[in-house]
A protein has these predicted regions:
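A short, basic/flexible loop-to-alpha-helix module at the beginning of a structural domain
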Residues: 1-6, 117-121
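Conserved N-terminal glycine/acidic-rich loop preference
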Residues: 2, 7-18, 40-54
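N-terminal Rossmann-like FAD-binding beta1-loop-alpha1 element of flavoenzymes
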Residues: 9-33
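Conserved N-terminal/central alpha/beta ligand/cofactor-binding core
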Residues: 36-134
Length: 134
């Protein structure tokens, strides 16, 4: 039995990059996401840890870039690292708008004005890892 499907865009991969692309495409497009397995079986779903971003007033983009380059041991391209770090705060904001419930210092406080619970993890000189508690 053959089935013919028509889409404007075929996104190959259902990890963070593929799903982010699919969510950011114009809504009038017919989009299909192709995955080699169940969405809950991919690497992104099982990844532990959080997302690194400059969210603390004592942190800077330059410090984050330096930490990443040191941890990368020569494997990272500085211009790519800088571009990623410079846009990390807006990426976190986009995730919040998509409904990601990042952990806050005071879970009972209203979202507006409530600081996020940030941690310092391997390779980072400042608290910049934001998590969504399970």
């Amino acid at each position: 039995m053959s089935q013919h499907l028509q889409h404007d865009v075929l996104v190959i991969g259902s990890g963070a990059a593929g799903l982010t692309l699919a969510l950011n495409l114009p809504t009038h497009l017919r989009i299909a996401v192709l995955s080699k397995g169940d969405l809950a079986n991919g690497s992104t779903y099982w990844a532990q840890g959080g997302v690194a971003a400059v969210l603390d007033e004592d942190d800077t983009i330059d410090l984050h870039v330096d930490d990443t380059l040191k941890a990368g041991a020569g494997l990272c391209h500085e211009d790519t690292v800088r571009l990623t770090v410079e846009h990390s705060r807006e990426a976190i904001q986009w995730l919040i708008e998509q409904g990601v419930p990042f952990t806050r210092e005071d879970p009972d406080a209203p979202e507006t004005g409530c600081a996020f619970h940030l941690t310092r993890e391997g390779g980072h000189s400042h608290r910049r890892i934001i998590h969504a508690a399970d």
